[in-house]
Amino acid sequence: IENINEKDVISEIIEIYDTNKMIFVKGGKFNFGSDNGLDREKPEREIIIQSFLIDKNLVTVEDFRGFVNESSYTTEAEIFGNAIVYNDSIDIWQLVDGANWEFPLGKSKKNSSHNHPVTQVSWNDALAYCKFCDKTLPSEVQWEYAASERGQKKNQLFYWGNDLLVNDKYMCNTWNSGYPNTIGFKDGFKYTSPIGHFEANSLGIFDMAGNVWEWCYNWHLPYEGNSQIFPTDLKGKAQRGGSFLCNSNYCHGFRLSARSATSPESSLFHVGFRCVKNITN
């Protein structure tokens, strides 16, 4: 840490925030976006970013339960009485009555596991949790900077390289076979996986590819210098990281620069989040 003022601020923050749960990401310059990706990822451009703290892990069911118990919070899925689930047996997305963060597939299905990422939480729910913890959701810039190890891995598809398998080992939780017609959990998981099951990146951050899409703070808009108009299904709050449903034959989501979006009130069974804490000098 080169700047004395920044060092003082960081020391004070570390006293407040459990650094066993958050990772300090030193700011700097990096190339954001990708000229080799989909149109929505273009153009690639240099950005200067300030230092911040980011959750080492995705927010878990257990974490979210603690928040609900302390704040008496009710999620939007619980208010609406349903949430969005993909039915792979008939290849269709459905609104399932009773689906929520405790029962991601619906009340008639298995309840959520305490050490898995919480899902069926809307952007509004995720932000409410972050604010309760005196944090916020990451911007897309922060997310990509952290996922790419401060921009050091931007010449790769993923933070570990360009292949999903390394030495016959799956590096993240994705759909591992031909989607949607064949069983896709050669990595051991059909749906979510426990936090920290797969290897972290070199900064010590887990699940920055696959498992669940992650809500970001900003709206999903064309980048500066990109004049395209996004179709309706790409308008909403930005999401990053891909999920257990992503497969390279149809989904780009687990690449470092990949983007998606969903309306902020929507709750889905393959979308979760993590928090950041901004550091101001």
Predicted regions and their residues:
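Short, compositionally biased
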Residues: 1-105, 124, 150, 273-281
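Functional-site microenvironments in short loops/helix caps that host divalent-cation chemistry
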Residues: 25, 31, 36, 74, ...
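General helical structural elements
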Residues: 244, 259, 278-281
